[in-house]
């Protein structure tokens, strides 16, 4: 028997658990209903379809993105984007949901506002701040989506043909996602804002 009444919040929480543990492909209304020990038809009182469920899941995800408090603009940007990266790593399905057409939600606006405000405060004009926001966002999504290291087991590289790949392969085949993102973020900010 269900422990709590059925609500949008309960449906989204169940959807997040399923997506986190089983993947986005497993996220169906039937699966959510089973998780909540209810019939699929009862979900339709709260959500229209899977598309709306994904939009609600995206809203829930955006609420978890950090909006840092006061401090120097560059420090706020680093904290904000590293925090967003942690949220994305915790939810492997996030990049796919964010790429849906319904991904811009009211809950995502505080994150965008804080980042763009920090870029403006750091001295960028409006156009450059918009470009900087997009570039940083693309860095985040790109690193999350491309989560495999170069150098899969069994893959060989001829050192005579690919000397640079051979020399860097130990570094390419091991990937610490957090350290890699932090390094990339700092390099990007150095390019946009100038070195510290």
Predicted regions and their residues:
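Basic, helix-initiating cap at the start of DNA-binding domains
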Residues: 1-38, 47-55, 179
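Hydrophobic alpha-helical connector segments
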Residues: 66-108, 133-136
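Amphipathic alpha-helical packing segments from all-alpha helical-bundle domains
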Residues: 79-80, 99-135, 141, 155-163
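Alpha-helical structural segments
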Residues: 9-17, 21-22, 52-68, 72, ...
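Residues in the recognition helix of alpha-helical DNA-binding motifs
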Residues: 46-47, 132
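C-terminal peripheral helix-coil segments that are non-catalytic and often amphipathic
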Residues: 121, 149-196
